[in-house]
Amino acid sequence: MLAVVEQGSKQYLVRKGQVISVEKISAEPGKEVEISCVKCVLDEEARPHFGVGTVKAKVLAQERGEKLVIFKKRRRKNSRRRNGHRQYVTILRVTDVTL
């Protein structure tokens, strides 16, 4: 089964066994979390079920993502600024998708 879940401010298309990287969740590695904000679930016959279902996932790690570089330049002024940051992310393995 496939499911569209919303975690943080993003939506992910997930299936059982898939590893995804989402915005930080306050849970220790090894814990089981339940994602209740499920937008759509596709069953085996590809019929959509909207607004129902749950997705369970296991927390694999708490990490930091890749560096995002912000570069601002004002043309003809010899003025530029380079800045960057790394977001905290949680690595999840989807263990179950149910209706």
Swiss-Prot record:
Pfam families: Ribosomal_L21p. It comes from the Bacteria. GO terms for cellular component: cytoplasm; ribonucleoprotein complex; ribosome. One of its GO terms (biological process) is translation. The keyword RNA-binding applies. InterPro entries: bL21-like, bL21-like_sf, Ribosomal_bL21, Ribosomal_bL21_CS. Keywords: Ribonucleoprotein, Ribosomal protein, RNA-binding, rRNA-binding. GO terms for molecular function: rRNA binding; structural constituent of ribosome. NCBIfam families: L21. Belongs to the bacterial ribosomal protein bL21 family. Part of the 50S ribosomal subunit. Contacts protein L20. This protein binds to 23S rRNA in the presence of protein L20. This is Large ribosomal subunit protein bL21.
